[in-house]
């Protein structure tokens, strides 16, 4: 992460703010918010452990940019443009139309979920994160064919899952009690990533406090 796009490019001093320092700062803020929410939850649900909520949000926040390619959104556009080219089209011949769309509209958030759950050389289950952590990480719980071009709600244009990872996310949703979203925009559309992660962690720990915090998924 340290050598990826700087959040503030071309600094005029020696204070370099990279994706690594950005992610560490977001994780720190997330941990504090998670602890605050966890304490509030504990007032209503005695079996909620505030530190669990804090750890879930911190882990999700630390990983929130892990799927971003070099050069950030410009890198996403470059990958998508390649797969829309004649040469890229040939590389996609064996895929379904939905799988092709995943790459023609490449999204770092979807790649991040894939990295966390699959792309680990010595494991078929990625980083073995808990269901609650993966639920909190997933900012845009939809595939590319479900993303909508809604100018009033920019986040609805994004997707956070590839077709190959839908079953894994279904397991995450089932373990954590996440509900299928209605089609109309919700109140969380324009909230920050840390706030969304905190809400997801809150929903998860409230639904099944002891189970989802410890449950690790197996990827088929």
Residue ranges and their predicted role:
Residues 1-3, 13, 24-29, 33-59, ...:
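Sequence-structural signature of the catalytic-core scaffold of metal-dependent phosphohydrolases
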Residues 6-17:
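Asp/Glu-centered strand-loop micro-motifs enriched in Gly/Pro and often flanked by an aromatic residue
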């Amino acid at each position: 992460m340290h050598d990826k796009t700087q959040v503030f490019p071309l600094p005029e001093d020696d204070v370099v703010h990279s994706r690594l320092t950005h992610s560490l700062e977001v994780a720190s803020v997330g941990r504090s918010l998670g602890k605050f929410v966890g304490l509030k939850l504990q007032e209503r649900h005695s079996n909620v452990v505030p530190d669990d909520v804090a750890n879930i949000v911190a882990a999700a926040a630390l990983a929130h940019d892990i799927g971003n390619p070099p050069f950030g959104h410009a890198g996403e556009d470059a990958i998508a443009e390649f797969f829309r080219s004649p040469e890229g089209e040939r590389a996609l011949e064996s895929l379904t139309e939905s799988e092709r769309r995943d790459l023609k509209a490449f999204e770092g958030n979807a790649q991040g979920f894939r990295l966390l759950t699959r792309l680990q050389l010595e494991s078929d289950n990625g980083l073995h994160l808990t269901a609650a952590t993966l639920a909190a990480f997933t900012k845009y719980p939809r595939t590319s064919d479900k993303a909508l071009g809604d100018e009033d709600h920019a986040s609805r244009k994004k997707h956070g899952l590839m077709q190959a990872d839908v079953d894994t996310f279904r397991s995450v949703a089932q373990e954590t009690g996440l509900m299928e979203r209605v089609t109309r925009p919700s109140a969380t559309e324009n909230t920050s990533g840390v706030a969304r992660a905190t809400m997801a962690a809150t929903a998860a720990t409230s639904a099944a406090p002891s189970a989802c915090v410890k449950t690790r998924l197996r990827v088929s």
